[in-house]
Amino acid sequence: TYPNKFDQIMFGSVDEAWNLGATAVGATIYFGSEESSRQIVEVAQAFERAHELGMATILWCYTRNNGFKKDGVDYHTSADLTGQANHLGVTIQADIIKQKLPTNNGGYTAINFGKTHKKVYDELTTNHPIDLARYQVANCYMGRMGLINSGGESKGASDMAEAVTIADIN
C-alpha cells in the first residue's frame, strides 16, 4: 500500500487453501503497528483452523513502530523486542517463525516499554550475534517451535557475505 502502513490482510481462507491441496498456511504480523491487535486475533483464528485440518503454520513475525527508533538506534531487530514478537507468534500456534536476525539488544529499556530485568542484559545475554539469536530461539518455547532467521534489504556487494554470516549464526 502507499503510503506504507504496516498491515496485512487475509486474501483467502484456511479452508480454501486446504481445498486446493495446501499443507501449510502463512501470515505476517507487524507487532507494534496500529493494526497488530487485529492481526494477532485474525492470525490466531486462522492458525487454529489450520491445525484442526492438520496443516502447518508459518508466521512472518516483524516489529514495526516508529517508536522503536530511539537516539539514532533502530531497535526493530533488537533481540528482546523480536524475542517478544516470536513468543507471541508461537503462543498463537505458529509452527515456524520467520524473523530477522537480531542486530542489537535493549529495545525495551531504550523505548521504556514492557517489563524486563537488568539481568537479561547483564547476565543472560551478550552482544554476540550468536547469543542474540539464541535469545530469539529461547522465546520460541526454548526452540520447540522452529525459527528461521534471514532477510533484510539488499546491500549489493555485501549480500553474499551477509548470507554466509546468517547461515553461520543459524
Regions inferred by a protein language model and the residue ranges of each:
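Alpha/beta enzyme core
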Residues: T1-I148, S154-N170
